[in-house]
């Protein structure tokens, strides 16, 4: 065991997910790219060399399909990326998504019971660019409601979830929590921050 640690400013891990069929295979979204391990974390190798990978989604039915949200103010090649070979190669998604000029975070979630249904939220630092949905695994996208889920913290704190039994129930969180009961057509703000 080596107890000689060094600290590097502004380097962090944003997200860690695992393959639901192989718990030895994990993926880490970091400030320095996306990393993969096939031996439970003993060794890691970079699989997406982009600055500020902030969110990862592994398809629960087809774990060879992954999505990675890349970007913040300083990212060059920001956008939503998809891999169809366990993270070995990546392509930038664009069919129906806006130009990647945002300076905030991209988050992504998928339907645990329908591999084709994916939702992404693209944000600026203090506001939402858009909420988008794909019903064909990311081949094309269409815009959902224009709720400002990312207000005040679009570069940092956000979460997204499609309910595992009722895919019409979607939760999106930032400073406030938003809920849709019709598959994302309308989101209603459920909380009010008063700090």
Show which residues each predicted segment covers:
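Extracellular glycan-interacting surfaces
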Residues: 1-195
